[in-house]
Amino acid sequence: MATIKIKQIGSPIRRPESQKKVLIGLGLGKMHRVVEVEDTPEVRGAIAKLPHMVAVVD
């Protein structure tokens, strides 16, 4: 299955708890970390919920 790389570009400080949980669910938590995850509709939805905190890296 295809994978995508996601980089955290925003801090979870002063963000709602639900956004923090989505960030942890993606495997992130600290600034400028990059993780490689499977490209599924669930992951795409999580990325869409946090456009101000994560970016897709080529």
Swiss-Prot record:
InterPro entries: Ribo_uL30_ferredoxin-like_sf (IPR036919), Ribosomal_uL30_bac-type (IPR005996), Ribosomal_uL30_ferredoxin-like (IPR016082). GO terms for biological process: translation. This is Large ribosomal subunit protein uL30. HAMAP family: Ribosomal_uL30_B (MF_01371_B). Part of the 50S ribosomal subunit. One of its GO terms (molecular function) is structural constituent of ribosome. Belongs to the universal ribosomal protein uL30 family. The keyword Ribosomal protein applies. It comes from Novosphingobium aromaticivorans (strain ATCC 700278 / DSM 12444 / CCUG 56034 / CIP 105152 / NBRC 16084 / F199). Keywords: Ribonucleoprotein, Ribosomal protein. It holds the Pfam family Ribosomal_L30. One of its GO terms (cellular component) is large ribosomal subunit.
